[in-house]
Amino acid sequence: MKFVDEAVIRVEAGDGGSGCVSFRREKYVPDGGPDGGDGGDGGSVFLQADENFNTLIEFRFERFHMAERGENGRGRDCTGHSGKDLILKVPVGTRAVDHDTEEVLGDLTTHGQKLLVAKGGFHGLGNTRFKSSTNRAPRQKTLGTPGEVRSLKLELLLLADVGLLGMPNAGKSTFIRAVSRATPKVADYPFTTLVPNLGVVNPRPGQSFVIADIPGLIEGAADGAGLGIRFLKHLERCRILLHIIDIEPIDGTDPVESARAIVGELEKYSPKLASKPRWLVFNKTDLLLEEELQQKVDRIVKEMGWEGDVYTISAYNRDGTNELALKLLDYIASLPPEDNEIDPDSEVEFKWDNYHQANLDSVNEDYVDEDDDDDFDDDDYDVEVIYQR
């Protein structure tokens, strides 16, 4: 299936049902009191993470999603049915962003997690709600409020512990093939990898981590060169980055300049991402003699001013790859667990209890009627509809 990691959709929550103006009519009770019921609440729209999905391709072809409207109230104090909520299944790792305001609504990082993205409208009130000692025959009702309408941008961010970055043809895909059972395409030309790939690494029995391989970066990627930086977002949730450097580029480019270009593009894209733990990994060491290799590694590290961890591997021959995988496993195990608790401040607030209270108070204060409700004639009055904004 085609990998799609971005989609823009429109979600519409259901409108609330309107209240009803009705009066009790039974045998021997020709002029009963009010019995108009409330409307039903409109259905809301939720996103739910599902581990059985791994792409957003369905949302490319189906962009409009609407929840059910609440039913109107009816006589005999019958409340209208609430609209059915609409639940949209998305892959684990999906981020929801308001397309108009760029506000991040939330991240779905665990299977079954739900996120409210459009709140259903509140139900209207029937005339029974306006009954009081001074208003025996109320002809007021309120309409249901409109449901929330939102344009959403869905972004799929891969969930991985380790992220690979580097120039095209640095050997990232070869490395992920060497340490996992992933089989990304490998060839001797740039940009062989066109979409991100995931691999599960098992250095020890019962212990594993996930590694992500993204298409290579080149200088100017932040300005759209090559495949741009659209795939860098997949590294945002990684806990450590491996900067793969081709120790002996076939095109004769300077590894130092290439490494600096990658770091520069990373900082342009996101200083937060650039500040993540990062290890230097020199690949294709089988192309150099041992003494020459060490001299070249020392020179590159010195010119870069690098003070972090440095490793040398040959992904093609799988020299040093298992040792590096073990180091990564131990490092990830030493990190504190990630905090995925939902921020309560990010949840949608809705004032259910006092939403219509202002209308009820104003009607009861302004409306004074000393007559009993058994002595009125329906035809002498008009129904008053109270509109809510």
Curated annotation (Swiss-Prot):
Keywords: Cytoplasm, GTP-binding, Hydrolase, Magnesium, Metal-binding, Nucleotide-binding. Pfam families: GTP1_OBG, MMR_HSR1. InterPro entries: G_OBG (IPR031167), GTP-bd (IPR006073), GTP-bd_Obg/CgtA (IPR014100), GTP1-OBG_CS (IPR006074), GTP1_OBG_dom (IPR006169), GTP1_OBG_dom_sf (IPR036726), OBG_GTPase (IPR045086), P-loop_NTPase (IPR027417). Residues 160-333 form the OBG-type G domain. Its cofactor is Mg(2+). One of its GO terms (molecular function) is magnesium ion binding. It is found in: Cytoplasm. CDD domains: Obg. One of its GO terms (cellular component) is cytoplasm. Its EC number is 3.6.5.-. Its main location: cytoplasm. One of its GO terms (biological process) is ribosome biogenesis. HAMAP family: GTPase_Obg (MF_01454). Belongs to the TRAFAC class OBG-HflX-like GTPase superfamily. OBG GTPase family. This is GTPase Obg.
